[in-house]
């Protein structure tokens, strides 16, 4: 797009403060009082001054890792933010009016996957047991799953497909843009880099010369069970004191966050275990199996009945995704087809970054499915 488009009526952005009981005393000590942005389309003001105006479908925007919902309402150069995009699509009559909700699910580990974890917090419960009822009380929504959907990209896309599986009683349609899938590839390729980053926080520090592998294994027995020997804690403490993270640090904290998401263990030093021995680099099969219990490509069969209740499932991914998610997306589509689950799957010539323009495809599909 060459310049900003302004023809559409902008609607109204409301920012509320929500006090969460679910997130109070969460394991990371993250705030339980959070801002919740809600965008109301121009049609919401029909019958202004009364509560007799139209009730509308609701779409929840689950942002990606390192993001927060309200960030999707920020001004963007050239492209649309999500409220602008929704306003334009409504103005162009490509979709009907809907309320958009932007939850804040950021954590000290950089984000989460919109699931419950004893190491991070109960973010699935936060969404389904607190935010949904709160929004339905405060706004004129069509307050049933048949008129409520969620969409997201990357971690948000993962959250959308997982909620369509495990929490389908709350959602009528979902859109998964480049969501994490096929963990063997999407996460496995990056863990060696994370181990190298964590090695910087090993004590004692590495020195050149002979390396006594048997002695190191005896001294660090916990590593074979995925336990921290102190380097992960030192890594996190160092990052939490920084204003800017390097690319390697950003990827490392992402993988640490995934470990806290997929393999929490209240008995472990940090409340979770790692899937690799940090000294030898060996994958720990018992720990990795816990990760695979959360892989969408392996969950379709288990949740096929729930997925079939959804009125729309949309999945897409760029075929140059730098995290190789397009392979997992293809497998996911294949598994959905094998179980007779209706869905739309598309690919496009792009990578993982700055692909919000794909919402021009997904949002109309969701709105058509959720309209009264």
Residue ranges and their predicted role:
Residues 1-372:
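Non-catalytic cap/lid and distal C-terminal segments of serine-dependent acyl enzymes
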């Amino acid at each position: 797009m060459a310049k900003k488009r302004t023809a559409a009526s902008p609607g109204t952005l409301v920012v509320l403060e929500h006090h969460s009981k679910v997130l109070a005393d969460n394991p990371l000590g993250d705030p339980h009082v959070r801002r919740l942005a809600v965008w109301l389309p121009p049609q919401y003001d029909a019958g202004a001054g009364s509560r007799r105006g139209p009730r509308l479908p609701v779409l929840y925007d689950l942002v990606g890792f390192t993001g927060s919902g309200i960030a999707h309402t920020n001004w963007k150069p050239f492209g649309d933010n999500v409220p602008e995009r929704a306003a334009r699509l409504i103005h162009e009559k490509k979709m009907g009016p809907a309320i958009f909700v932007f939850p804040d699910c950021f954590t000290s580990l950089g984000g989460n996957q919109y699931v419950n974890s004893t190491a991070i917090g109960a973010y699935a419960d936060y969404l389904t047991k607190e935010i949904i009822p709160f929004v339905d009380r405060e706004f004129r929504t069509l307050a049933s799953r048949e008129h409520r959907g969620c969409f997201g990209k990357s971690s948000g896309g993962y959250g959308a497909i997982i909620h369509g599986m495990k929490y389908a009683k709350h959602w009528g349609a979902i859109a998964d843009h480049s969501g994490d899938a096929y963990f063997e590839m999407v996460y496995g390729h990056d863990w060696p880099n994370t181990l190298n980053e964590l090695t910087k926080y090993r004590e004692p520090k590495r020195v050149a010369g002979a390396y006594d592998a048997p002695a190191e294994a005896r001294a660090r027995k916990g590593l074979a069970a995925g336990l921290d020997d102190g380097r992960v804690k030192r890594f996190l403490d160092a990052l939490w004191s920084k204003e800017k993270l390097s690319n390697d640090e950003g990827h490392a904290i992402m993988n640490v966050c995934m470990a806290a998401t997929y393999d929490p263990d209240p008995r472990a030093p940090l409340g979770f275990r790692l899937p690799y021995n940090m000294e030898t680099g060996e994958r720990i099969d018992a720990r990795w199996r816990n990760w695979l219990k959360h892989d969408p490509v392996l969950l379709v069969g288990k949740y096929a009945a729930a997925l079939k209740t959804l009125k729309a499932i949309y999945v897409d991914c760029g075929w140059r995704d730098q995290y190789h998610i397009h392979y997992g997306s293809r497998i996911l589509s294949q598994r959905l087809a094998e179980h007779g689950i209706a869905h739309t799957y598309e690919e496009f010539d792009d990578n993982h970054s700055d692909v919000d323009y794909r919402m021009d495809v997904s949002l109309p599909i969701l709105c058509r499915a959720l309209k009264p």
